[in-house]
Curated annotation (Swiss-Prot):
Keywords: Amphibian defense peptide, Antibiotic, Antimicrobial, Cleavage on pair of basic residues, Disulfide bond, Secreted, Signal. It comes from the Eukaryota. This is Brevinin-2Ta. Disulfide bonds join 68-74. It is found in: Secreted. InterPro entries: Antimicrobial_frog_2, Frog_antimicrobial_propeptide. Belongs to the frog skin active peptide (FSAP) family. Brevinin subfamily. Expressed by the skin glands. Residues 1-22 form the signal peptide. It comes from Rana temporaria (European common frog).
Length: 74
């Protein structure tokens, strides 16, 4: 019975300490006075970035092909 009380007391103490540290960290973030903007990481943003990168690659190859044909160096 004593060991069970001892372990529960230790568990409660460690939980209280970790909760206190989390609250201090949260309060420190709020004290900055500025709103931090979270980066949106959704599947639509990922697809948009992928399409943008693919579009740049295709455009670059088209420009290279057109300049090659116009200059006659192909």
């Amino acid at each position: 019975m004593f060991t069970m009380k001892k372990s529960l007391l230790l568990f409660f103490f460690l939980g209280t300490i970790s909760l206190s540290l989390c609250q201090e960290e949260r309060n420190a973030d709020e004290d900055d006075g500025e709103m931090t903007e979270e980066e949106k990481r959704g599947i639509l943003d990922t697809l948009k970035n992928l399409a943008k990168t693919a579009g740049k690659g295709i455009l670059k190859s088209l420009v290279n092909t057109a300049s090659c044909k116009l200059s006659g160096q192909c």
